[in-house]
From Swiss-Prot:
Coiled-coil boundaries: none
Motif (CXXXC): 5-9
Family: Belongs to the AosR family.
Superkingdom, taxonomy of origin: Bacteria
Protein name: Oxidative stress regulator AosR
Disruption phenotype: Deletion mutant shows no growth difference in vitro in nutrient rich or limiting media, but its survival is compromised within peritoneal macrophages at day 4 post-infection. Mutant shows a marginal decrease in the survival upon exposure to nitrosative stress and markedly compromised survival upon exposure to peroxide radicals. Failure of the mutant to upregulate cysteine biosynthesis during oxidative stress generates a domino effect, causing differential expression of 6% of M.tuberculosis genes, resulting in attenuated survival.
Regulation of catalytic or functional activity: Activity is modulated by the formation of a disulfide bound within the N-terminal Cys-X-X-X-Cys (CXXXC) motif. This intramolecular disulfide bond is formed in response to oxidative stress, and results in oxidative stress-dependent interaction with the sigma factor SigH.
Length: 218
């Protein structure tokens, strides 16, 4: 069985990823134009990131293109989003409700209706810009992933976009894997979703390493 993502190599300190991939550390280099963040990807890792990001952009495009239009949008140019939460579970994870009070009583219809109405207004107003931000980050990742793998160098803006986009990819995969706040940490090798879980873990470590080097910790 290939190494499970998240297992550290004792000799190199690198983290082994899905199907034996290795999450390579990022290196921060100071230049006249600001910091640069360097690493490398294997060809199959680059292809995976491109496929996942492309699929996520497609989901967001579908959601955006189906949003309602109204007279106010035509007059002001301010886009109106959906008032209702997405039906697709992956989109619900990417575009969650904006507001839920800690003391909300689900058995109180009046309180629930008030919360849903407030969420609908916030979603209609803010969802379009959130979709745009997620698409921009995912597209920035696509634009900076080397086509056939190999070395890559990110600006600080690129690095922040990668962190946001990879986090969204993890959220999307987490829906398929039904991952909650506490795990699971790994799946048996014969589990039907073991390969997807290994990808999820690989993305987690990739994101963690980039966050650390961006903060100057590594």
């Amino acid at each position: 069985m290939p190494p499970v993502c998240g297992r550290r190599c004792s000799r190199t300190g690198e983290i082994r990823g899905y199907s034996g991939s290795i999450v390579r550390r990022w290196k921060r280099v100071e230049t006249r134009d600001g910091p640069r963040f360097r690493s490398s990807l294997a060809p199959h890792e680059a292809a995976l990131l491109k496929n996942l990001a492309g699929a996520m952009i497609g989901l967001l495009d579908d959601r955006d293109s189906s949003s309602p239009s109204d007279e106010l949008e035509e007059i002001t140019g301010i886009k109106t989003g959906h008032a209702q939460r997405p039906g697709d579970p992956t989109l619900r994870r990417l575009l969650p409700d904006f507001y839920r009070p800690d003391d909300l009583d689900d058995d109180d219809p009046t309180a629930v209706d008030g919360s849903e109405s407030f969420n609908a207004a916030l979603r209609s107003l803010h969802e379009p810009e959130i979709i745009d931000a997620k698409r921009v980050a995912a597209q920035q990742l696509l634009d900076t992933v080397p086509d056939n793998g190999g070395r890559l160098e990110l600006t600080e803006s690129d690095a922040n976009a990668w962190i946001a986009a990879v986090n969204d990819l993890r959220l999307a995969l987490g829906v398929m894997l039904e991952i909650g706040p506490r795990g699971p940490e790994r799946l048996p090798g014969n589990h039907p979703l073991a390969a997807h879980f290994n990808v999820y873990q690989w993305l987690t470590v990739l994101q963690e390493y980039l966050v650390l080097v961006l903060m100057g910790s590594r």
